[in-house]
Design a protein with these regions (language model features):
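Mature catalytic core of soluble alpha/beta enzymes
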Residues: 1-2, 9-289
Length: 289
């Protein structure tokens, strides 16, 4: 999972070239709610007037997708796929099938740095959970051969997903929050929302203009060396997502070594480098993840 704190301010000195009907009927006092879902804090702020129903629709979409996707939630569709590994294909909803196909695409095109079948390794380390620990090399060597997205098979006609080897596990946490955020954005736009902030545990999308001056939003990037809420810089954006992954919130410390939550599917160990955080700006959050 990609975690960070983004501070979004409703004004920015950078003026938009055009202003249209999306800037009308806005308020600086948003209709908003914050709920704890998917193991993280989720906030939606809508700056259009009279859009409480859209807020409800947005959270309903989060809950539905979380129930289908969460790998650690017994009974979720991804959990069912994992339970039938090496046994039989599992028919899934259109949403889960779409997410799995996207995960396969990114597994193919990430130069082996992302693998949707990383589940046997992430479930071994369990970084981010109270029982996180460094496994033995033997444990890693035993599970590493199971990490291979090429052993995930799809049937478009039947809309099924099949893990061909027993004990394989999907873990879509690397892109799930981004996918869900994109889906929430679609719901809000369909409901006529033109100005909003969607923040799912630090995966942020800024929709439309800021209500303060009908311009870009200012998105602050968390300083990885400072306390939560301290920005190292800011980015002016509109209709974009800003995703930052860092080692400063979810990690395991063993002796003097810090292991991040970002797993290398080639080694079975967390990636080791000198980067404390990386920010990506893109139109679709799933791409940023």
């Amino acid at each position: 999972l990609l975690l960070m704190l983004l501070t979004v301010v409703t004004g920015c000195s950078t003026k938009s070239k055009t202003q249209n009907k999306s800037t009308t009927n806005l308020t600086t006092k948003p209709t908003e709610d914050t709920q704890f879902l998917m193991g993280t804090v989720c906030t939606i702020k809508i700056y259009n007037k009279n859009k409480s129903a859209a807020l409800d629709d947005g959270f309903a979409r989060i809950k539905k997708l979380a129930d289908e996707i969460t790998v650690n939630q017994k009974g979720s569709e991804v959990d069912k796929i994992n339970a039938e590994a090496g046994k039989k294909p599992v028919k899934v909803s259109a949403d889960v099938y779409d997410l799995c196909k996207k995960a396969y695409y990114y597994s193919q095109n990430s130069h082996e740095s992302f693998d949707m079948a990383i589940g046997p390794i992430t479930s071994l380390w369990r970084i981010g959970f109270p029982d996180a620990h460094k496994p033995t090399q033997k444990q890693i060597d035993t599970r590493l051969p199971l990490v291979n997205y090429l052993n995930v098979k799809f049937n478009d006609a039947e809309r099924t997903v099949y893990l061909t080897r027993k004990n394989m596990k999907l873990d879509l946490g690397g892109i799930a929050k981004g996918y869900i955020t994109d889906q929430v954005k679609k719901v809000l736009v369909k409901d006529g929302v033109t100005s909003a902030i969607i923040d799912l545990g630090g995966n942020v999308y800024v929709l439309g203009p800021s209500p303060t001056n009908h311009s870009n939003w200012t998105v602050g990037i968390q300083d990885p060396k400072k306390s939560r809420g301290t920005a190292i810089g800011s980015i002016p954006e509109m209709n974009k997502t800003i995703v930052t992954s860092g080692i400063y919130e979810r990690y395991l410390k063993v002796g003097k070594t810090i292991y991040s939550h970002l797993m290398d599917p080639k080694t079975g160990y967390p990636f080791q480098n000198n980067l404390m955080g990386v920010s990506i700006v893109t139109k679709n959050l799933v791409d940023g993840d």
